[in-house]
Amino acid sequence: ERISDHSVNLLESAEEMHQKEIHFSKDAQEELQVLEDAVQDTLCRTTDAFRKGDLHLASKVEPLEAVVNELVRAIKARHVARLQAGSCSIEYGFVLDDLLTNYERVCDHCSNVAVAQIEVAQDSFDTHAYLNDLRHGNDTKESEEFHRRLDRYRERYLFPDGQTAEEN
């Protein structure tokens, strides 16, 4: 239900852009396409993992969600740089921020679904501890796999200029 709420918000942002004839720069469009591809990948992996009861697939969602967060931060930073250069407007920034927030929240909910699926299968439900161990665990198999996937997703979702979100 929450994911669909954010989908409606994205639709409303698109309608606002159409009504106000807001068109992002080519660079912003290309950056958003990278983000949208990563969000779509996150949604597909989450729904497939849930539908199939596939814990291995569910474990691939969290590193992808982390990359989406990095992409959102990088797009915001790049927008600020365009604002400072005078090649973008504040009004565009409000719409962009709405889009980014909703994409990020969709992926947050996907992460919640995948982590809950894993935790229930392990007869546990300490999500914060699980995520902390995953991201900062010392030489655990799960943590190592998380970081391998994180690096792979960073390479997959490069900006058109060849930079990863982490490099921004």
Which stretches of residues belong to each language-model region?
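Cytosolic, long alpha-helical scaffolding segments
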Residues: 1-168
